[in-house]
């Protein structure tokens, strides 16, 4: 007859259905939570990239107002901020097209346009060199975006070249001749296709983290000449000793 059967079997079926529904809800809840966490990290990275671009725009305005001191200070802050953005993006492994485009535009604005304006546009030679610097920055960014380099950068990264110019501007009080010489040297390093290691300072050796934290502390709590000398030494050590100093101890993720 219908409706007859083992009651234990019926109850076990009900329990299995309940467990299945609970498991489905738990999996769905965990999936939503992971998506929200990933979305929040994307927002943080995008906000930092936007802040980087705003600093670059302020640096441009300061250069037009002939306040190279403030313009250089903005670029040094952007240099430290860019390292944090790059480390977070690589460490979290968050592919985000809009975020990448925003960060690329921020890099071009800050470390391309704003850095080139430190040279000044008063004379034809300065203006021509500033244009060459911007074009070199664009070429280097396009080459890296399409080159597919995984073990490191090809050509000197733009933030380090910008850090050298900003530090030199602070130490020389905006000496145009010295800045033009340094900019010419940075252009050669950027178009040279030598390999430079990824600057995952915050995900590497402890001494590299100390170098980064020291830069942050000096930038906000010490006189500018000392900060500029510190950042200049940091950048030049990366330029001239990329593998011996900065290429060791980087954690290779599986």
Curated annotation (Swiss-Prot):
Bilayer topology annotation: Multi-pass membrane protein
Major site of localization recorded for this protein: membrane
Keyword terms, alphabetized: Membrane, Transmembrane, Transmembrane helix
GO CC terms: membrane
Top-level taxon of origin: Eukaryota
The keyword Transmembrane belongs to this UniProt entry's keyword annotation: yes
Subcellular location: Membrane
Transmembrane segments: 44-64, 69-89, 113-135, 171-191, 210-230
First and last residue of the signal peptide: none
Protein name: Transmembrane protein 269
UniProt source species: Mus musculus
Lineage, uppermost ranks: Eukaryota, Metazoa, Chordata, Craniata, Vertebrata
């Amino acid at each position: 007859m219908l409706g007859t059967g083992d009651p234990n079997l019926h109850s076990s079926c009900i329990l299995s259905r309940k467990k299945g529904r609970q498991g489905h809800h738990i999996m769905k809840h965990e999936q939503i939570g992971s998506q929200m966490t990933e979305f929040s990290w994307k927002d943080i990275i995008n906000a930092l990239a936007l802040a980087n671009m705003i600093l670059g725009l302020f640096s441009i305005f300061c250069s037009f107002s002939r306040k190279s001191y403030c313009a250089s200070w903005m670029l040094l802050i952007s240099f430290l901020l860019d390292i944090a953005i790059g480390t977070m993006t690589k460490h979290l492994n968050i592919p985000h097209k809009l975020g990448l485009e925003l960060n690329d535009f921020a890099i071009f604005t800050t470390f391309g346009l704003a850095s080139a304006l430190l040279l000044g546009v008063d004379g034809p030679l300065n203006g021509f060199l500033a244009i060459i610097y911007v074009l070199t920055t664009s070429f280097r960014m396009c080459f890296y975006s399409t080159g597919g380099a995984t073990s490191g950068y090809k050509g000197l990264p733009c933030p380090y070249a910008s850090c050298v110019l900003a530090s030199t501007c602070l130490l020389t009080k905006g000496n145009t001749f010295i800045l033009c010489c340094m900019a010419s040297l940075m252009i050669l390093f950027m178009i040279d296709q030598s390999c430079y290691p990824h600057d995952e300072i915050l995900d590497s050796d402890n001494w590299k983290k100390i170098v980064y934290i020291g830069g942050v502390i000096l930038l906000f709590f010490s006189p500018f000449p000392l900060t500029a000398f510190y950042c200049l030494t940091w950048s030049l050590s990366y330029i001239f000793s990329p593998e011996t100093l900065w290429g060791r101890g980087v954690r290779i993720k599986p």
